[in-house]
């Protein structure tokens, strides 16, 4: 017999809230300087022309313009902003 009470049901009933990661502005969309384009963990997408990267790897626009997703090389992506 068990020498402790069964407490699985109370211990298992938890879940962490979502982190709201992902693409916030899509290709061809107009952005203003400072707009967040992607929130990510790590550099799944790299910073291209006219975009900056925050310390949490958030990619944001440095100028007003249009978002363009490109390939950096065979297995890396980058995102750039080009003026209108």
Curated annotation (Swiss-Prot):
One of its GO terms (cellular component) is cytosolic large ribosomal subunit. Signal peptide: none annotated. Keywords: Ribonucleoprotein, Ribosomal protein. Gene3D superfamilies: 2.40.50.100. Pfam families: Ribosomal_L27. The keyword Ribonucleoprotein applies. It comes from the Bacteria. PANTHER family: LARGE RIBOSOMAL SUBUNIT PROTEIN BL27M (PTHR15893:SF0), RIBOSOMAL PROTEIN L27 (PTHR15893). This is Large ribosomal subunit protein bL27. The gene is rpmA.
């Amino acid at each position: 017999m068990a020498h402790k009470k069964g407490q699985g049901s109370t211990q298992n009933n938890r879940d962490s809230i979502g982190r709201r990661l992902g693409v916030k502005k899509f290709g061809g969309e107009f952005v203003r300087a400072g707009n967040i384009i992607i929130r990510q963990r790590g550099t799944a997408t790299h910073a291209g022309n006219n975009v900056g990267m925050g310390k949490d790897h958030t990619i944001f626009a440095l100028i007003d313009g249009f978002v363009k997703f490109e390939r950096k090389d065979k297995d890396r992506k980058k995102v750039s902003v080009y003026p209108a």
